[in-house]
Design a protein with these regions (language model features):
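Conserved N-terminal beta1-alpha1 strand-loop-helix module at the mouth
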Residues: 1-48
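Active-site mouth loops of central-metabolism enzymes
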Residues: 14-32, 90-103, 173-191, 267-281
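Conserved, mostly hydrophobic/aromatic
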Residues: 18, 46, 112, 199, ...
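Glycine-rich, proline-tolerant flexible connector loops at the mouths of alpha/beta enzymes
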Residues: 41-74, 128-139, 204-220, 303-305
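Catalytic cores of alpha/beta
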Residues: 101-114, 191-195, 220-223, 243-249, ...
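Flexible, glycine-rich active-site loops centered on histidine and acidic residues
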Residues: 102-149
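Active-site pocket-lining/capping segments in soluble small-molecule metabolic enzymes
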Residues: 125, 138-171, 176-185, 192, ...
């Protein structure tokens, strides 16, 4: 069943979360333990992130350096299959423009098709660490709309080179990202919503938001996208606040605001455990208000926050 159908057919606000593939050279057991911690809350689906390759430089000892490419977290497709097979939970691998050519993406789609994994989250992805602005790979999609169009062509039975796909399979369905506080590269919110609508017109069936800590921004964003004629589910993305250092790290990394009330209370905390408890309580209140307003699902970003999410879920699910 597709993600959008899972959301529609649950009799309560759906629960889902995102995980990262293990670091290269490590095992999957830690990831399984995280899922085991949260599986009792009946996740409707689990997202698996994808990570682009980065350039690294190795000193050769003669004053010269050798450049090579390294993916620190490979294995998204395999992890998605492993989770699905072990837990019988729908998995949603992320598909990126960033770091991938159209041919690379096509091979990923073929692998997923063989595994009967047909739900995707379609994203542009972050720029490389050495870049000041995003640069697509050679013969790679420049933004999520182009990536969605490639997936549409694949669903219609056409490879990147124009040759036909001779086998008919279940078509991919996909969601996209959206930003209640605007994508950092968008000149204004209206332009950001314009591109979201284009992705919906291309075939996106739902959108998951960037994390936020002020529900008013989510509600205002939903009003704006509805006014623009966008009627797909807008799923709030949530991550419990955990550390005082996040007062600066979160705005810098995710380009979102921390509400003054939360910031002031966090500064009063004298221990990490106290700060973590504050974040859990804040998240519980956020989720209760979102559920009261009838959100279709709540999607949790679990990295470094599994135990906090468990405490939140115990109250709201």
């Amino acid at each position: 069943m597709k993600v959008v159908d899972l959301i529609k057919h649950t009799n309560k606000t759906a629960f889902s979360f995102e995980v990262l593939p293990p670091l290269k050279g490590t095992g999957i057991e830690k990831l399984y333990r995280s899922i085991d911690t949260l599986r009792d809350f009946d996740p409707q689906y689990i997202n698996i992130t994808t990570h682009r390759s980065e350039y690294v430089y190795k000193e050769l000892g003669n004053g010269l350096f050798e450049r090579s490419r390294l993916r620190r977290r490979p294995g998204t497709v395999a992890v998605a299959a492993a989770i699905h097979n072990k837990y019988n939970i729908t998995t949603v691998p992320h598909i990126l423009c960033s770091g991938f050519s159209r041919e690379d993406i096509e091979y990923v789609l073929l692998d997923l098709q063989f595994l009967n994994i047909t739900d995707l989250l379609v994203l542009r992805g972050d720029k490389a660490k050495h870049e000041s602005t995003f640069t697509p790979e050679e013969n790679g999609p420049a933004h999520a709309l182009e990536l969605a169009e490639q997936i549409n062509d694949f669903n219609r039975g056409v490879f990147v080179d124009g040759s036909p796909i001779k086998v008919t399979n279940t078509p991919f369905s996909y969601g996209v990202a959206c930003y209640p506080e605007k994508h950092e590269e968008a000149p204004n919110m209206e332009q950001d919503i314009y591109w979201l609508k284009k992705k919906v017109e291309a075939g996106a069936e739902y959108a998951v938001t960037q994390l936020f800590y002020d529900n008013r921004k989510y509600f205002q964003f939903v009003e704006k996208v509805r006014a623009a004629g966008i009627n797909i589910p807008i799923i709030p993305g949530i991550k419990p606040f955990r550390k005082q250092s996040q007062l600066s790290v979160i705005p810098k990394t995710f380009k979102v605001d921390i509400p003054q009330e939360l910031a002031l209370e966090a500064l009063k905390c004298t221990t990490e455990k106290e700060t973590e408890r504050l974040g859990i309580e804040w998240c519980i209140q956020q989720c209760k208000e979102l559920i009261k307003h009838g959100v279709p699902s709540i999607h949790f970003y679990s990295v470094g926050a599994v135990e906090s999410i468990k405490e939140v879920a115990k109250v709201i699910y």
